[in-house]
């Protein structure tokens, strides 16, 4: 097993979330409106997001960032690629539907950049410290020499594990049921990841506005689970 294959567990481990934070991303609002009542409703919400939610766009941008890093490393069109990198990063960050979501992205990205710096991979391409989670994730995977397909799969896995960690405290659903949900999500994550690999950004379909509305209906998305 290669070193890069092992390094990916630094990113996806639910026991070591980046920066020690977990975000509920609107679950409290769903719970208040009685849309989340049990493990099945949590599972349906996560599946819906994986299949038609904005998380797909975040995942697709990973590939663009990864390709840009490769071109920059090869000294190809440095100015143009740096401009494209910053433009895409600002675009995906501004696409978030609430201030809390943007702050979440910035915090998680900063923590991941701090981690990669400790591993000897300091990010030097932007002066603006307000970067997106997708950019930081792609940078980490590029530095750790993780393949693009694994990068996308791990991204979806980590996101779904984060949602389940939040659901454990908010609903709660119980740790055993959360593990069963995570198991059932594996096939969907694999399918969706391959779809993302084969599509351009303009070809992605998004039709799930429920979570975006839920995120706007409550003020504090930050759930402090690992700072005890």
UniProtKB/Swiss-Prot annotation:
Belongs to the UreF family. The keyword Chaperone applies. It comes from Prochlorococcus marinus (strain MIT 9301). The keyword Cytoplasm applies. One of its GO terms (cellular component) is cytoplasm. This is Urease accessory protein UreF. UreD, UreF and UreG form a complex that acts as a GTP-hydrolysis-dependent molecular chaperone, activating the urease apoprotein by helping to assemble the nickel containing metallocenter of UreC. The UreE protein probably delivers the nickel. One of its GO terms (molecular function) is nickel cation binding. Keywords: Chaperone, Cytoplasm, Nickel insertion. InterPro entries: UreF, UreF_sf. Pfam families: UreF. Required for maturation of urease via the functional incorporation of the urease nickel metallocenter. Its main location: cytoplasm. It is found in: Cytoplasm.
């Amino acid at each position: 097993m290669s070193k890069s294959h092992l390094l990916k567990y630094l990113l996806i481990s639910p026991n070591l979330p980046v920066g020690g934070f977990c975000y509920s991303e609107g679950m409290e609002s769903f719970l208040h409106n009685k849309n989340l009542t049990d493990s099945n409703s949590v599972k349906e919400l996560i599946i819906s997001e994986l299949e038609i939610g904005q998380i797909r766009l975040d995942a697709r941008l990973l590939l663009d960032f990864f390709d840009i890093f490769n071109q920059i490393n090869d000294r190809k069109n440095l100015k143009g690629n740096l401009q494209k990198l910053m433009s895409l990063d600002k675009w995906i960050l501004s696409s978030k539907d609430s201030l809390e979501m943007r702050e979440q992205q910035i915090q998680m990205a900063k923590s991941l950049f701090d981690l990669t710096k400790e591993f000897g991979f300091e990010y030097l391409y932007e002066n603006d410290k307000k970067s997106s989670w997708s950019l930081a994730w792609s940078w980490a995977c590029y530095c750790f020499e993780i393949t693009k397909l694994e990068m996308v799969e791990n991204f979806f896995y980590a996101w779904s594990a984060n949602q389940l960690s939040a659901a454990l405290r908010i609903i709660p659903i119980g740790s055993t049921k959360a593990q069963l949900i995570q198991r059932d999500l594996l096939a969907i994550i694999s399918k969706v990841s391959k779809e993302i690999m084969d599509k351009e950004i303009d070809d992605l379909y998004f039709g799930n506005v429920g979570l975006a509305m839920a995120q706007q209906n409550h003020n504090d998305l930050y759930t402090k689970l690992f700072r005890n």
